[in-house]
């Protein structure tokens, strides 16, 4: 692509040596274009910046001879705008399709297509052979896209929602103008879950009413709410031939969830939605949508109205290139060890306080019962500069996902991907000072 002549400027042996160094430096960038998969080892930031700069310079707003008379010409007032968008000021997509190439943005279009290819290779490394797109919107809005696609392709008009006290998916259903049928949770010891037979009964009732239901299940959520049994739900949805969308916000970071997804994909799963920030350590703002159904992924991309910001997609790409598969798997391993440490520390603390280390199902978060106002305890932790814990009263039907009275007041703490060991130790230490 580049053609410049340095012959005769320096001795031939030096010329060859210089070309060797340059080619070696650019090899990782060349591999991204040629192999279109996540690198095993991460690429350093300077090379990623060069890679992004190279692509962004292909967009028409960088053409010094371009005559720009449209209403949308990537005109920016400040250089900061260009920096924040990594130079992709035209964004991605066209008004009719998120993944369509944008004629004014050759570089951004290549960047987005590469991101999706690399994302698919990343999932393959994790054992999921899926089609995938990085979305420029977070989990809740990405769920809206999936529901909109289900309505268009299958005529779905009501969402069966096994109750989880998460405002984002609830608002996602409202946003696309679909009705919702909640399926209530039940209590089993310390755990809260939704029986699959109740989900099936809800599907039957909606079909009897002449509606076309789809199911929005929850794979990842705060305990004591269990993961939905997505494998059995997938079997039910296959049997009734109805769409099944899974909210797997932080499912990618732990093998416990990945194994469930592998099994569920054998049956009816139309799409899974995950968060880029919760799994790939990006700034908030992007989503990951994946499925074994390439046509449904296409339908989802068609549901996005208008052109989109490239920035959330660039953030996803940067994380994939910077981490590489080897470092990501190491982060996954560290997360598992961090959760083990959190469990041990909270279990020890519960014995000191006379509370209970709750028997819940989560590879990410843990719960400990408390004998005083949990909301006040969480507030004290915040004032001690600890962010993340949730304090839930047993009478808080929304917080504990249970419409009855839960067994305990409790605190939830997380050991998600990227957490530092010292943060786990310090947070439990500060909680101990509050409780004792």
Curated annotation (Swiss-Prot):
Q: Where is this site: May act as a substrate filter by repelling compounds with a negatively charged alpha-carboxylate?
A: 71
Identify the domain of life. Archaea
Q: In which pathway does it act?
A: Aminoacyl-tRNA biosynthesis; selenocysteinyl-tRNA(Sec) biosynthesis; selenocysteinyl-tRNA(Sec) from L-seryl-tRNA(Sec) (archaeal/eukaryal route): step 2/2
Q: Which GO terms describe its molecular function?
A: O-phosphoseryl-tRNA(Sec) selenium transferase activity; tRNA binding
User: Can you tell me which residues bind pyridoxal 5'-phosphate?
Assistant: 72
Could you tell me which residues carry N6-(pyridoxal phosphate)lysine?
278
**Keyword Protein biosynthesis set for record:** yes
Spans annotated as Tetramerization = 1-44
Give me the residues that bind substrate, please. Answer: 94-95, 102, 307
UniProt GO BP: conversion of seryl-tRNAsec to selenocys-tRNAsec; selenocysteine incorporation
Pfam family membership, one? SepSecS
Region annotated Phosphate loop (P-loop), chain positions? 93-103
Keywords in alphabetical order: Protein biosynthesis, Pyridoxal phosphate, RNA-binding, Selenium, Transferase, tRNA-binding
Q: Which reaction does it catalyse?
A: O-phospho-L-seryl-tRNA(Sec) + selenophosphate + H2O = L-selenocysteinyl-tRNA(Sec) + 2 phosphate
EC numbers listed for it are 2.9.1.2
Function of the molecule: Converts O-phosphoseryl-tRNA(Sec) to selenocysteinyl-tRNA(Sec) required for selenoprotein biosynthesis.
Tell me the subunit arrangement: Homotetramer.
Name of protein: O-phosphoseryl-tRNA(Sec) selenium transferase
Originating species: Methanococcus maripaludis (strain DSM 14266 / JCM 13030 / NBRC 101832 / S2 / LL)
**Which gene is this protein's source?**
spcS
């Amino acid at each position: 692509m580049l053609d410049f002549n340095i012959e005769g400027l320096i001795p031939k042996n030096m010329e060859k040596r210089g070309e060797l160094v340059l080619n070696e430096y650019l090899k990782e960038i060349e591999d991204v274009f040629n192999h279109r998969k996540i690198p095993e080892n991460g690429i350093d930031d300077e090379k990623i910046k060069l890679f992004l700069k190279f692509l962004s310079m292909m967009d028409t707003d960088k053409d010094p001879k371009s005559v720009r008379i449209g209403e949308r010409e990537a005109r920016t007032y400040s250089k900061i705008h260009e920096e924040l968008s990594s130079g992709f000021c035209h964004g991605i997509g066209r008004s009719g399709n998120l993944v369509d190439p944008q004629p004014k943005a050759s570089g951004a279009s290549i960047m987005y297509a590469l991101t999706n290819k690399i994302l698919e290779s990343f999932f393959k490394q994790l054992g999921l052979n899926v089609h995938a797109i990085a979305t420029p919107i977070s989990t809740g809005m990405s769920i809206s896209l999936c529901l909109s696609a289900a309505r268009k392709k299958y005529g779905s008009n009501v969402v069966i929602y096994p109750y989880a006290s998460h405002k984002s998916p609830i608002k996602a259903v409202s946003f696309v103008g679909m009705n919702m049928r909640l399926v209530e949770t039940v209590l089993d010891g310390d755990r809260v879950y939704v029986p699959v037979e109740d989900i099936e009964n809800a599907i039957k009732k909606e079909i009897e009413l002449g509606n076309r239901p789809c199911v929005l299940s929850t794979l990842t959520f705060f305990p004591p709410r269990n993961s939905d049994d997505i494998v059995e739900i997938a079997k039910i949805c296959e049997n009734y031939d109805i769409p099944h969308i899974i909210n797997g916000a932080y499912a990618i970071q732990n093998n416990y969830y990945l194994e469930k997804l592998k099994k569920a994909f054998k049956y009816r799963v139309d799409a899974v939605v995950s968060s880029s920030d919760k799994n790939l350590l990006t700034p908030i703002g992007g989503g990951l949508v994946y499925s074994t159904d390439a046509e449904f992924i296409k339908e989802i991309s068609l549901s996005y109205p208008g052109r989109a910001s490239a920035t959330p997609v660039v953030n996803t790409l940067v994380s994939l290139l910077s981490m590489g598969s080897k470092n990501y798997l190491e982060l996954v391993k560290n997360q598992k060890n961090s959760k083990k440490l959190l469990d041990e520390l909270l279990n020890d603390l519960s014995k000191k306080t006379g509370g209970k280390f709750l028997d819940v199902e989560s590879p990410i978060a843990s719960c400990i019962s408390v004998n005083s106002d949990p909301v006040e305890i969480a507030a004290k932790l915040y004032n001690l500069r600890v962010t993340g814990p949730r304090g839930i009263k047993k009478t808080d039907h929304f917080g504990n996902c249970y419409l009855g009275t839960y067994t305990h007041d409790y605190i939830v703490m997380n050991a998600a991907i990227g957490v530092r060991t010292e943060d786990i130790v310090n947070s439990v230490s500060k909680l101990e000072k509050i409780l004792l």
